């Protein structure tokens, strides 16, 4: 869980980073699911992921985790795609 300020709005981001040799094994999806569940358990009402628009694998992880693509925005000088989920909601 990483606190972020996106378009002047405080958000909490689900983040993960895996070494290349672990890609394609479902580990990022498993980590994202666990992070999502834990975030909601401790009381966060909304979680996001900020993803490079060219990172198709991470976008798939976000979708598998139930996050919806909301928008593209500029974050720290780079274009990112914002995926989000609210507690007890789906796309």
Stretches with model-predicted labels:
Residues 1-91:
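Acyl-donor (CoA/ACP) binding surface of acyl/acetyltransferases
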